[in-house]
Amino acid sequence: MLAFGLTVVRHGETQCNKDGLLQGQKIDSLLSDIGIQQSEAAGQYLRDVKFTNVFVSNMKRAKQTAEIIVRNNRTCHDLELVADPSLIERSFGIAEGGRVIDMKNMAKAAGQPLPEFTPPEGETMEQVKLRIKDFLKAMYQRIANDHQDKVQDGGTSSADESTEAPAGLANDGVSSVPVHALVVGHGAYMSIAMRYFFEDLKCPVPRGLDPAQQFSICPNTGMCRFIITLKCSSVDIALSDIKCVFINRRDHFKTN
């Protein structure tokens, strides 16, 4: 068994975010001044949290956010940032570059909830889930290869098994976990990933979490954290357990 922490962070604000425009995959924006400030604040919040691996979407807004967070960290500033195209934002097809409110109106006209609506030429939720599965498989393999010395025999793991609500600290859930991956990605992609974790993988909902928050769009530089346990053998690596510590945390905004 190999237990590791997984902290997922949405990129900082871009001008398109501020203007209410859909970026998707065609608009590869850099961070706005506010987005840089948000990323610096996220980096300061996580500065004493040890990461052993960093994965990032290869879109500019995510890479810039990851670089700022890692630069502020006291233990992982020299880690390789592994750029993975499986982490890029959901494609919104012909709606990209247009206003978010216009896509909401398109979904309403089609009689569908916004998260489930697919604009022409866009990606369906199921297509994004396939990319999520591809990324998880690659991440599991990379972590197992990088941390073979942390694999334990039997059904126990070094993860914190506490069922108490998180204390609101930056290292909640990962203080006793020697392997910890940082992933920096995108809002719609993260929302679908949460659906996959909670609905498909049956991850328990954290105590005290408002169910309406489960699948809401994470704010810019908002954070989600999970503890994942892998079953490792000479022929296979498989998910054994997943627990959620928190989702959509934005405590570092207080420092802005």
UniProtKB/Swiss-Prot annotation:
Keywords: Apoptosis, Autophagy, Cytoplasm, Hydrolase, Mitochondrion, Nucleus
Site feature: Transition state stabilizer: H186
Enzyme class, spelled out: hydrolase
First-listed, main subcellular location of the protein, grouped into a coarse class: cytoplasm
Reactions the enzyme catalyzes: beta-D-fructose 2,6-bisphosphate + H2O = beta-D-fructose 6-phosphate + phosphate
Family: Belongs to the phosphoglycerate mutase family.
Protein's recorded name: Probable fructose-2,6-bisphosphatase TIGAR A
Organism: Danio rerio
